[in-house]
Structure formats: C-alpha cells, structure tokens
Design a protein with these regions (language model features):
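Domain-level signal for soluble alpha/beta catalytic cores
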Residues: 1-224
Length: 224
C-alpha cells in the first residue's frame, strides 16, 4: 500500500470572528458596552482561535486577525491626518471597502503588527505567522491631487520605512514568519488593464523586501 501523499499547507491569516465577539463589537459601537469589556471579548476570541488552531495539528498558527480593526487599515489606527473619502476597493464577491485619504504629512504607522504577535505568543508555544499589509496597499492613501508640502516621493519613502519596520517588528516579537497581504494586486489590473499599476505596486513592495537579507526574506511570504 502506498503512503498517503502529504501536501504542505498553512493558514492564510483571517478566521471568521465568533458571534460573541461580533455582538460585543456591535454593543460597543452602540454605546452599550465599555472599552474594558470589549478588550476582554477580543482576548477571549484570540485565545479560543489559537486553541482551536492547535487542535488542527497545523504546523504554524495565526491569530485569525481577531483583534485587528481591518487586515488593510490596522496601521492607521489613531492617526489624525486622514479623511474618509479615499479610494474604493472592489472585491470579487461584490462588496467594497473605502480606504481613508491622507491629508497631511509626514506619514507614520499608528499601530505596528508586533503587538498582535506578542498577544498571540502569550497564548501558545507553537510557531506564529503574522500577516501584515503591503506597502502598495497603503500607497493608495496618497491623493491624486497631492498634498502641499509633502510630495508623493517623500510619502513613499516614509511608507517604505514604516513597512520595513512593521515586518521587522513582527519578526523581533517572535513571529516564525510574516505574510505580506498583497490582494490589491488583482485590483490593480481592474484599475489599469495595461499592468502599469501592478508593476508599480511590485516595484514598491520590492523596495521593502530589498532591505532584508536573503535569510530574512526566507521568513517572509506574499499572499495574493
């Protein structure tokens, strides 16, 4: 009898939030639940997700992105130099998400992914993979009309610095690997069928990856 073939797999990142957490978030936004209670709900969802992941026998775990406000916009938490009328991103299932728009520089991340890694590491001894958003996705925050006194070139330079710091921070905090979410790669072909925007996205992300050694890049993957 031939042995069953083994296909190496690992989780991508996101796991649907449990009903209890969804109810807690809704209650918080309705003013019926305090911040401390919401944080407890986030912590319980995180612990439950990781425990269930452990039971699957997966060689690497994720936090399920249970505590992120969004896989794409978590770095923007707490920033005051944004407006709400940014680029609208359409997804293949028909839903859309609208990004904020940067209105002043300099650009800095409000939150880095290392905090999510530390929270997950406190729940397990198994390897953790941390998802981070790509520099190319965040580049969509810069408005077409520009920002007086803050050029697009300076914004991109600042962005590359922040994206590098996001990855390094996650690795330093104990992530076994880091996954760069680059799902806007497909979107770029809708916005620009010539492929020019896609090439620009790839070039920007490569600027970030070029700052890592070959050994370090062995711990960084890209999700498209």
């Amino acid at each position: 009898m031939y042995p069953h073939p083994v296909i190496p797999t690992e989780p991508i990142g996101s796991i649907p939030r449990p009903p209890a957490l969804l109810e807690a978030i809704a209650s918080y936004h309705a003013g019926a639940l305090g911040h401390d209670a919401l944080e407890r709900a986030y912590s319980e969802a995180l612990r439950d997700t990781i425990q269930r992941f452990e039971q699957t026998g997966s060689p690497v775990l994720t936090d399920g992105e249970q505590t992120k406000p969004s896989f794409a916009t978590y770095p923007l938490s707490g920033l005051s130099n944004l407006a709400s009328d940014g680029v609208v991103i359409p997804f293949s299932d028909g839903h859309t998400r609208q990004l904020p728009k940067l209105i002043a520089g300099p650009f800095r991340y409000g939150v880095h992914a290392e905090g999510y890694v530390r929270a997950a590491r406190a729940c397990t001894q198994l390897p953790i993979k941390q998802a981070v958003i790509s520099a190319s996705a965040i580049s969509l925050l810069y408005p077409e009309q520009g920002i007086p006194g803050y050029s697009r070139e300076q914004f991109l330079a600042d962005l590359v610095d922040e994206a590098e710091a996001d990855i390094r921070g996650a690795l330093r905090a104990g992530a076994a690997s880091v996954q760069i979410d680059f799902t806007e790669g497909r979107l770029s072909l809708k916005l620009d069928p010539t492929g020019g925007l896609l090439k620009a996205f790839i070039a920007l992300n490569n600027q970030v990856l070029d700052r890592f050694t070959e050994e370090e890049r062995g711990r960084v993957g890209v999700h498209v």
